[in-house]
Design a protein with these regions (language model features):
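Short secondary-structure capping/junction motifs at helix and strand boundaries
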Residues: 2, 104-109, 154-155, 430-433, ...
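Kelch-like beta-propeller repeat domains
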Residues: 11, 19-358
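Membrane-embedded helix-loop-helix hairpins and adjacent transmembrane boundary segments
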Residues: 352-836
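Alpha-helix capping and helix-coil boundary motifs
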Residues: 10, 73, 151-152, 217, ...
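Basic side chains
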Residues: 2-3, 34, 70, 117, ...
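Bacterial Sec-dependent N-terminal signal peptides
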Residues: 1-19
Length: 836
């Protein structure tokens, strides 16, 4: 028994624990006790307006409620200040609204609501204010109103109609879902009427923001959340706890996909009260009897699951205001009721955080991996004999190693994290794209590979000069080098961002570690070090993914069977979207985009083509291409299974999620750090480093090859082999350092707008290069001027598509390539006619 206890303690000590924590601390109290008030963050501090109380005679003794001068409206923090909306006074509901300047506290009238409302909820998102629920002098309001902000001149409009007859005192928030942002209306209640019983809503309804933007959404367009059945912190227990009411509560979106709820009434006690079943002493019990919620209720939009986080008695209030502290962390939670009729002056500072620590054992594993990669660079540097070894590995790379290298190169850390994140948030609809890699392998082997091998080139862009002219070669090589350096920065930055979020490792340290180690080992050892490094890193990736799949399956309640059942019940294994839309990832968009984009990558990307030239012969290169295709189809299944496993695990363990997580792409690294033993987590984090470094090393070596061969050697034809190697090494260092520095700068930028630009530029560039190589291989009569004109035409059409249509970005490659080919052919018709 003692031995088992010791073993359990030892194993627990090795776990990487990441735990959500709710921190509360008292702040300066209000001047008077109020509930149903308005609050905003004005000039660096909390500002209170309105509210109500029983200042003279207690409510239990028949006291009169006093309004100051109104209450039960909504206050919403907006850019530049706060808006106070509607409410009621002692006689009627109100429609008047105020805007309070966040700097000087001055107030100005704001556009009045379309009708007087009280006991509703409101929120702000992306330039729009939304109002939902409530009532007008006792008549329920089913409409959802919206108004642009700050351009409020358009006035309020009806954005949607709620599917429920009455939701008084609901909570409203906008948060991410698998399909984009959605407006959620949670909880609320309906009082007893002549035709219906009283009801406390224990679910929420939601609708995409994109639908609301169009206006006039009907009740059938809303979807429902699961009921607020909270399992609390004992996530392994299936014992059902009471339903949680969301009445008298406040809420806020947190992180990428959570909503947190503070305070509120007890479901059963409140339902009895509004149904008229309360006892005669209802207003005279001690505050603890009413069971106002002190714990923090959480809702996760991706898994549609609820949880409870341990809170504090300071949060056990109803009708309080939750105000985001602008420029700081957390919220101010002010006023409210301690029990029916008894108001509070309390103000509480609330923060929700997640403790993170990487741990010494994980650091040890990661350090050993990095040292091993440096040792590999030193080993291959000693074996190197001239330029052919540096650029082509002496033609002695085995076919299977070349295939694994291609696979590891194309599978960056972004892919390693985003594929699980994609199947976690949605389904498997992107998986058929990987089938296209294997399908494309056959024409690449039959037509392109012999062409590349026959010309015996070192840089892929030498082909374009031999086939067209030197300008085409220089243009393509320049664009490739620019694209690769920017890609290095992106591939360094994004995984570092996610790793920082879940491990606590400084983002700059992440970038520098991965960047410097990669630059050193690939500069020392040339392409041979890169390829064998890819093999090691590829195996780490594959075995790490397989281990994660098994670990997730056995960790889900019900094991593998439970995992499959949950996935099927929630449609997480869907492979095809059979609709005909060209703006979504429908079946034909996936197939067409997958074919074109993979054909472009495997026929015009120097990082891939260089692998074709490192094997002893053409047959070996073909086998390597097939190895990559087979791995892409079958091994990559593991990454989709990981995403599905993450969904099923967190569906059954909702409180284990980091509610502060800022992006869904961090979900897999977060699982590693929070659920796996130390050391194992370090090995899997090393796998993310490996995915990053395999891509970066290939990019660095390819840029060095392109610069040295297409520019230096092209214009310095008498350069010796030893000089070429020196130039290539310096090109590796310079290009790698530029990429590293750019990644460090990205850590200080607003990266989202840059990523949008980068994705657009990626579609523009790759489609044009793919078209050039297709023309070079298959269209012998097309001249250089026609090929360049086709390139420009393809780029122009793709740019037009991206700016003026809603076409899915997966179609850019196919469209640009097709336009390039057709334009070049049309401009070369005279050559075909002369031949005829």
């Amino acid at each position: 028994m003692k031995k088992n206890l010791f073993l359990s303690f030892f194993l627990c000590s090795l776990l990487c624990v990441a735990q959500n924590r709710v921190s509360v601390s008292p702040a300066a109290p209000l001047d008077r006790a109020v509930s149903g008030h308005y609050a905003g963050w004005i000039n660096g501090g909390l500002s209170i307006y309105g509210g109500c109380n029983f200042p003279d005679v207690p409510c239990a003794d028949g006291g009169q409620k006093v309004y100051y001068p109104r209450a039960y409206g909504a206050s919403v923090q907006v850019p530049g200040g706060v808006v106070y909306l509607g409410g009621m006074d002692s006689t009627a509901s109100l429609s008047e609204c105020l805007f309070i300047n966040g700097t000087d506290g001055t107030s100005t009238p704001f556009a009045s609501l379309p009708k007087a409302l009280d006991n509703f909820a409101a929120t702000y998102h992306d330039g729009t204010l939304y109002v939902a629920g409530g009532q007008t002098d006792g008549t329920p309001n089913k409409d959802v109103y919206s108004i642009p902000f700050p351009n409020k001149e358009e006035g309020w409009s009806i954005a949607a109609t709620l599917p429920d007859e009455c939701r008084l005192q609901p909570c409203v928030a906008v948060q991410n879902t698998a399909a984009g942002h959605a407006l959620f209306v949670f909880g609320g209640y309906a009082p007893k009427t002549e035709g219906s019983e009283a009801k406390v809503h224990t679910d929420g309804v939601y609708i995409p923001v994109a639908v609301l933007k169009k206006g006039g959404a009907i009740p059938t367009q809303w979807k429902r959340t699961s009921p607020t059945l909270a399992l609390g912190n004992n996530t392994d227990s299936k014992q059902e706890k009471p339903l949680q009411a969301i009445v008298g509560s406040t809420c806020s979106p947190v992180g990428y996909s959570h909503v947190v709820f503070f305070g509120g009434v007890d479901h059963d006690i409140f339902l009895n009260a509004i149904a008229g079943r309360q006892d005669s002493q209802y207003l005279r019990h001690a505050p603890e009897w009413y069971k106002f919620r002190k714990d923090v209720l959480t809702y996760h939009t991706i898994t549609d699951s609820w949880g409870l986080l341990p809170g504090d008695s300071l949060l056990a209030r109803a009708g309080a205001c939750l105000t985001p502290e602008v420029g700081g962390k957390g919220w101010s939670y002010s006023g409210g009721e301690l029990m029916p009729g008894v108001r509070s002056t309390d103000v509480t500072h609330v923060e929700v955080s997640n403790d993170k620590s990487f741990g010494w054992l994980n650091w040890t594993v990661l350090t050993l991996y990095l040292i091993g990669m440096l040792g590999m660079g030193i080993y291959f540097m000693r074996k190197e004999n001239g330029a052919d070894d540096f650029f082509k590995g002496g033609g002695r790379i085995p076919w299977w190693a070349a295939g694994i290298s291609i696979y590891a190169t194309m599978l960056s850390a972004i892919t390693y994290m985003t594929i699980p994140a994609k199947s976690y948030t949605t389904d498997w609809t992107y998986y058929p794209m990987l089938w296209m890699i294997l399908l494309v392998s056959f024409p690449v082997i039959k037509y392109y590979l012999p062409y590349f091998r026959k010309l015996n080139v070192t840089s892929a862009y030498e082909i374009l000069e031999q086939r067209f002219n030197v300008f085409t070669r220089m243009l393509a090589s320049t664009l490739f080098c620019i694209f690769m350096i920017v890609r290095m920065a992106i591939v360094l930055y994004l995984p570092s961002l996610a790793l920082t979020a879940v491990t606590g490792i400084d983002i700059y340290l992440c970038i520098i570690l991965m960047g410097l180690v990669t630059i050193i080992y690939c500069t020392m050892g040339g392409v041979e070090a890169v390829i064998w490094g890819d093999v090691v890193q590829g195996l780490i990736l594959v075995f790490g993914a397989i281990f994660a799949v098994i670990y997730l399956a056995v960790s889900t309640e019900g094991g593998i069977g439970g995992c499959i059942d949950i996935a099927l019940d929630n449609d997480k294994l869907r492979l095809f979207d059979w609709s005909n839309s060209w703006s979504q990832a429908t079946w034909w968009v996936i197939i067409l985009g997958g074919l074109a984009n993979n054909l472009i990558s495997y026929t015009s990307d120097q990082t891939v083509i260089q692998r074709y030239l490192t094997t002893p012969d053409e047959k070996s290169a073909g086998r390597g291409i097939l190895v990559n295709g087979v791995m892409s189809v079958f091994v990559s299944v593991a990454f989709y299974m990981i995403g599905t496993g993450l969904y099923t695990f967190y569906k059954t363990h909702p409180v284990e999620l980091d509610i502060t997580m800022g992006q869904s792409d961090a979900i897999f690294p977060f699982f590693m750090m929070s659920q796996m033993p130390a050391g194992v987590a370090g090995a899997l984090i090393a796998a993310i480093f490996a995915a990053t470094m395999s891509t970066i090393s290939s990019n660095i070596n390819s840029v060095a090859t392109a610069f040295t061969i297409d520019f230096w050697k092209r214009f310095r034809t008498s350069t010796t082999d030893s000089t070429l190697v020196v130039v290539a090494r310096w090109a590796s260092v310079v290009s790698g350092m530029i990429g590293l520095l750019l990644a460090l700068f990205m850590a200080t930028w607003d990266i989202q707008s840059f990523l949008d630009f980068f994705n657009e530029a990626l579609g523009l560039l790759t489609s044009g290069l793919g078209g050039l190589f297709f023309i070079a291989v298959f269209m012998k009569r097309v001249k250089g001027y026609a090929a360049l004109a086709g390139f420009v035409a393809g780029e122009a059409v793709v740019f037009w598509m991206s700016e003026y249509t809603d076409a899915n970005f997966l179609l850019f490659g196919a469209t640009g390539m097709a336009v390039s080919i057709v334009t070049a052919w049309l401009l070369s018709l005279d050559s075909y006619f002369r031949k005829s």
